[in-house]
C-alpha cells in the first residue's frame, strides 16, 4: 500500500477489488451458490476465489469472509511476533497458528464475530520466557487485532527446536 508520514505517524493505504463471477448455467452448482461466488483481486497478487460460508449457501472450496477475517488476525499476529523476535535477536523460529472464531447470528440475520482464539505453537531454541514475552508484545502490536471490537485471545505454546515433535 501507499504511505505518507505526518508528525512521525505513518499512514498506509491498501486497496483491492471484489468482483462477482458470472453464473454459468452449465455447472452442477446451484445458481444460488454461484451467485455468491466472487474474486478478490489486487495488484501483483493471484486472485482469491471467494464465496459465502457453506452454512450461508456458499461453497466450502472457496474462502469466505469469516475465514479471511480469522486469517488476517492469525497472519498479523505471526508477522508481529516475527518482527519482535527478529528485533530482539532471536534466531531461527518456526511458528504455526491454529485459529478459531465464534460468529453469533441474531434472529434478524445480523451477526458479529464475538471472539477469536489464536493458538500459536512456536518452535525455537530461544528460552520460553523470551518467546512468551514476544507473543504478548505481538498481541499489542498487531494492526488487525487493534482494529477489531471482538476479544482476541492468544494462548502460545513453545517447543524446543531441537526436541522431538511432542507438544508441551
Task: Describe each region flagged by the PLM.
Residues 3-71, 79-168:
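Extended beta-strand/beta-hairpin segments
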